[in-house]
From Swiss-Prot:
Binding site for Zn(2+): 138, 141, 158, 161
Record InterPro entries: FlhC
Named cofactor requirement(s): Zn(2+)
Any one Gene Ontology BP term: bacterial-type flagellum organization
Subunit and partners: Heterohexamer composed of two FlhC and four FlhD subunits. Each FlhC binds a FlhD dimer, forming a heterotrimer, and a hexamer assembles by dimerization of two heterotrimers.
Cofactor note: Binds 1 zinc ion per subunit.
Annotated localization: Cytoplasm
Protein's UniProt name: Flagellar transcriptional regulator FlhC
Gene giving rise to this polypeptide: flhC
GO cellular component terms, semicolon-separated: cytoplasm
Length: 193
C-alpha cells in the first residue's frame, strides 16, 4: 500500500481551491491534482455552493480560430509562453499566472464572464503542446497569434490587422450599446413615419 504524503495532499487541496476559484472544470482538477474525484466534488461544492458542471471538455481547435476568441487566446498564450521562457514557473502554475494576467487585461464587465475560461485556456496549452495548434507571426503587425499547426510561413494576417466585417459592426455598437440601440430605433421610427 502506498502511503500518501500529507504535505502533497495539502498542496493539491490548495491548488484545487485556486483552480476552482478561477473556474476550472472537474476534468482539469482531476488531471492536475492527485485528489480523488469524490474529494474534488466535495471541495467544489464547498467553495462554489453547487456541484461541478457536467459534460465534456472542449475538444475542437476551431473555437480558437474565430476572430475574437483568437485574440483572447493569443493574449493568454503569449503570457504563458513568456512565463515559461523566463523560467518563472512551469506547468499548471504557469497556466494560473498567465490566466490571472489575462484577467487583468480583460476585466469582468457587468457580470459578463471573460471570453476565455480557465479550462479552455488549459485546453489551449494542451493543444499547442500536442502540435495541433501553434503560434504564428502576423505579416502586418509582427504579433504572434494562435493558428492551426503547420501554418505556412509568411501567410498569416491576424484579425486585428484584417478584422472580419462582423467585427466592425460589433465595434460600432459596443461603446454605449444602450444609447446607440435607442438611437438606431429612433432612426428606424423616423424612416418608417
Amino acid at each position: 500500500m502506498v502511503e500518501k504524503s500529507i504535505v502533497q495532499e495539502a498542496k493539491d487541496i490548495h491548488l484545487a481551491m485556486e483552480l476552482i476559484t478561477l473556474g476550472a472544470r472537474l476534468q482539469m482538477l482531476e488531471s492536475e491534482t492527485q485528489l480523488s474525484r469524490g474529494r474534488l466534488i466535495k471541495l467544489y461544492k464547498e467553495l462554489r455552493g453547487s456541484p461541478p458542471p457536467k459534460g465534456m471538455l472542449p475538444f475542437s481547435t476551431d473555437w480558437f480560430m474565430t476572430w475574437e476568441q483568437n485574440i483572447h487566446s493569443s493574449m493568454f498564450y503569449n503570457a504563458y509562453s513568456f512565463l515559461l521562457k523566463s523560467g518563472q514557473c512551469t506547468g499548471v502554475e504557469a497556466v494560473i499566472k498567465a490566466y490571472r494576467l489575462y484577467l487583468e487585461q480583460c476585466p469582468d464587465q457587468s457580470g459578463i464572464p471573460p471570453l476565455l475560461a480557465l479550462t479552455r485556456a488549459w485546453t489551449l496549452v494542451r493543444f499547442v503542446d500536442s502540435g495541433m495548434l501553434q503560434l504564428s507571426g502576423c505579416n502586418c503587425c509582427g504579433g504572434t497569434f494562435i493558428t492551426h499547426a503547420h501554418q505556412p510561413r509568411n501567410s498569416f494576417v491576424c484579425s486585428l490587422c484584417q478584422p472580419p466585417s462582423r467585427a466592425v459592426k460589433k465595434r460600432k455598437l459596443s461603446p454605449q450599446s444602450a444609447d446607440i440601440t435607442s438611437q438606431l430605433l429612433d432612426e428606424q421610427v423616423r424612416r418608417a413615419v
